[in-house]
């Protein structure tokens, strides 16, 4: 099974920001459960523009964070459902208002611990499904060998 192309985009953005493979796998394990890496999915499965109700995008941003995504898209003159825009917004959050969560994730040593830390401090999901996120992170970790290649 190959890694979802959207997951590759997110992984490369995170690698460029200095995240390790274990950290990247933990983040991606969460997004696998949140959205299957679909940047245009609304909570409940409807695909399209953000509705403002429930989560949106690969990170399932809600409330003020979804508003932040939409405003960020306007500033960048991009579609809020664009995978590259959302990857940039993820880094924007991790380097800004969610820096504490980013630092916590970076303190983890395994994909499973990274997944748990990202869940508790960044996603803050109503239904955690911690074990499933950790299992997804472990599976994804095994598919991140491309990050070891020069130029990636």
Located regions from the model:
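Extracellular cell-wall/glycan-interacting regions and their flexible linkers
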Residues: 1-28, 128-152
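Residue-level detector of well-ordered alpha-helical segments, enriched
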Residues: 23-27, 57, 86, 114
């Amino acid at each position: 099974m190959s890694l979802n192309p959207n997951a590759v985009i997110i992984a490369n953005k995170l690698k460029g920001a200095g995240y390790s493979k274990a950290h990247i796998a933990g983040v991606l394990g969460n997004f696998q459960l949140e959205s299957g890496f679909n940047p245009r999915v609304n909570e409940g499965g409807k695909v399209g523009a953000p509705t403002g109700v429930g989560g949106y995008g690969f990170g399932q941003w809600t409330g003020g964070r979804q508003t932040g995504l939409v405003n960020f898209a306007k500033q960048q003159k991009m579609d809020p459902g664009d995978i590259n825009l959302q990857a940039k917004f993820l880094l924007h959050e991790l380097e800004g208002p969610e820096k504490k969560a980013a630092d916590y994730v970076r303190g983890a040593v395994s994909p499973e611990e990274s997944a748990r830390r990202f869940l508790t401090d960044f996603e803050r999901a109503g239904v955690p499904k911690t074990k499933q996120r950790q299992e997804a992170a472990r599976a994804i970790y095994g598919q991140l060998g491309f990050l070891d290649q020069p130029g990636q």
